Swiss-Prot record:
Family to which the UniProt record says this protein belongs: Belongs to the PanD family.
Protein name stated in the entry: Aspartate 1-decarboxylase
Gene3D superfamilies: 2.40.40.20
Provenance organism: Caulobacter sp. (strain K31)
Co-factor binding comment: Binds 1 pyruvoyl group covalently per subunit.
Amino acid sequence: MLLTMMKAKLHRATVTQADLDYEGSIAIDTDLLDAAGILPNEQVDVLNITTGARFTTYAIAAPRGSKVIGVNGAAARLVQKNDTVIVVTYCQMPAEEARNYAPTVVLLEDGNRIKKAA
């Protein structure tokens, strides 16, 4: 049996921009993608802590060091600049492997700076 497990998350990211007219996605600073092990074009869930909204989209790379978390396309209606969000990815694995699996968790602080990564 395969279980769907959390692969990685960016916890308490701050939305820096929302662009309704840009083709869908969430732009994430390449440093943050690397820290979490999230790949460009990987499916992500975005959980808006500020409003409770949840949506699925895909990640694209924003310039390294920019601290950008930018929600694009239709999903931009579900966030506003300065909202706090969690970005989560998942993977599937056998139940036996899942018992000993540890996801990557990147905790962010003000300015989308990495506070802790594990």
